[in-house]
């Protein structure tokens, strides 16, 4: 990463007091000015601009300073120790909401139960519950801080109809509080590989966000296939690279039973990066969801039980 020039620091100092302190994180004057604007408009009343700029100079994430992050129609409270919602996650969650609201399910108000694993702030579960009619949810996380923050976000955003479960999803023993059946399973698991964490991740993330919610290999996707697929009609799991999609696809295609009943797709984000592995089971509701999400991404494996049906499959 190139060093910030002395001339740029001087220029920023002349524009606004403390603006130059934002440059190490923002990198450009334009981004620093935008962030300074957000700070002046949204900073909690008990904090000063000078304090906020100094915090950013120390690489404290903006969302922890402002204490919130917009996510769809919601304003999600953010606190240290819990992963900050990302735009990449918001993008695919909003795509789910749009697809469901434009479908027959919205017209007939068919009930849906959503289970959100690795819930963090609860942004996925709460956004789906808020945006979809006749929807209930279960949100699961191992972190006490996360579960407390989900409760706070439910109150702030006036979202009800949810059950919170504190449990380690990767534990060999399942919780009795898990739902017995799920219509839509969602998750943003820790997926940054250890080899990539120090090299690719921003300083602010490495210093201040919980490593537990960031770093992972394939364990969460192994858990998805081994434990969750029998319980759900569909799933949407965020990924960090196409290798994680390939693992899930391979496990399903190489299993004669799973390959018969599961269709698997891949969604890229607006930056052209592999972002979501998703799938639909060949059950009555799973088939409906498959039709609803026909344009969500690209189906890469079609369930052999549906091989006689027309589908968008590469």
UniProtKB/Swiss-Prot annotation:
InterPro entries: HemK-like, N5-glutamine_MTase, SAM-dependent_MTases_sf, Small_mtfrase_dom. Substrate binds at residues 188-191. It holds the Pfam family MTS. One of its GO terms (cellular component) is mitochondrion. Keywords: Methyltransferase, Mitochondrion, S-adenosyl-L-methionine, Transferase. S-adenosyl-L-methionine binds at residues 118-122, 141, 188. One of its GO terms (biological process) is methylation. GO terms for molecular function: protein-(glutamine-N5) methyltransferase activity; protein-glutamine N-methyltransferase activity; S-adenosylmethionine-dependent methyltransferase activity. Its main location: mitochondrion. Belongs to the protein N5-glutamine methyltransferase family. Present with 13200 molecules/cell in log phase SD medium. Methylates MRF1 on 'Gln-287' using S-adenosyl L-methionine as methyl donor. This is Mitochondrial MRF1 N(5)-glutamine methyltransferase MTQ1. It comes from Saccharomyces cerevisiae (strain ATCC 204508 / S288c).
